[in-house]
Amino acid sequence: MKINLNNMVTESRNPASANIDTLPTLEMLKLINDEDKKVALAVEQTLPKIAETVDKIAEAFRQGGRLIYIGAGTSGRLGILDASECPPTYGTKPEQVVGLIAGGHQAILHAVENAEDNQQLGANDLQALHFNSKDVLVGIAASGRTPYVLGAMTYAKSVGATVACISCNPESPMTQAADIAIAPIVGPEIVTGSSRMKAGTAQKLILNMLTTGAMIRTGKVYSNLMVDVEATNAKLVERQKNIVIAATECNREQAEQALAECDGHCKTAIVMILAGINAQQAKTLLKKHHGFIRPTISAVR
């Protein structure tokens, strides 16, 4: 397949860095930093599309659906990174947010040649997950033309799922195929075609927003506290205690006691203290209010 890179923003040359190979190290890094500053502003222009995607993901979660990221190379790795942080941060099941990469798990560490060029592989990977209409697919590719991702997007649409994409080329096959196209224009890279740089940074910022926003919308955050955090190591055990203290203004002993009584479920401990009820009552009320702390507390008061 012949690929024309000439019209891709991510493949064009950046005049600002034409002489970067002649600069002293500090000046070189200042130039890279100056370009990086443009990324957040580019992402800002896409906030309405990001918000639309967040709401679709949150609705899918409420209906028992999943968020599936799919990409190749850096894009795939970033999706896997974001997905892998959801269980420890928000207490989600590993299958609720999943990252797929062209070439499978071995491609996380090493490039798998030609994997990204096969559309059918993208569809096959979704089929292996039993992807269905309740799920949301987010295709990730700086170029917006990766066949592996396009194949997955085509399959996802065929089963009636919501399909979004993140691409740094606004007029691309992916943006045309998606229901929701998130396309920050970050401009040419410092090193021509090195889309792991500004494009990758933009992707990471957007992925952060997608999962964080969806978790907030589904009750996983109270105030600005990660109240469903799982205590999987010593640091997170302490974080749980600090979250309970911050949310309730109780003392350390009270926080530890409440957490012990509810098997270390941070959200339940907070409701126990704020509402003055026991662990079972707190769990029952939280379930009734779909895991949201504020309406749970209001119902008691």
Swiss-Prot record:
This protein's record includes keyword Lyase: yes
Enzyme Commission number(s): 4.2.1.126
Protein origin, superkingdom: Bacteria
Catalytic residues identified in the record: E85, E116
Entries under SUPFAM superfamilies matching the protein: SIS domain
PROSITE patterns: GCKR, SIS
GO molecular function ontology, one term from the record: ether hydrolase activity
Pathway annotation from the record: Amino-sugar metabolism; 1,6-anhydro-N-acetylmuramate degradation; Amino-sugar metabolism; N-acetylmuramate degradation; Cell wall biogenesis; peptidoglycan recycling
Keyword terms of this UniProt record: Carbohydrate metabolism, Lyase
Complex and partners: Homodimer.
Record-stated family: Belongs to the GCKR-like family. MurNAc-6-P etherase subfamily.
Name of the protein in its database record: N-acetylmuramic acid 6-phosphate etherase
Originating organism: Photorhabdus laumondii subsp. laumondii (strain DSM 15139 / CIP 105565 / TT01) (Photorhabdus luminescens subsp. laumondii)
The gene coding this protein: murQ
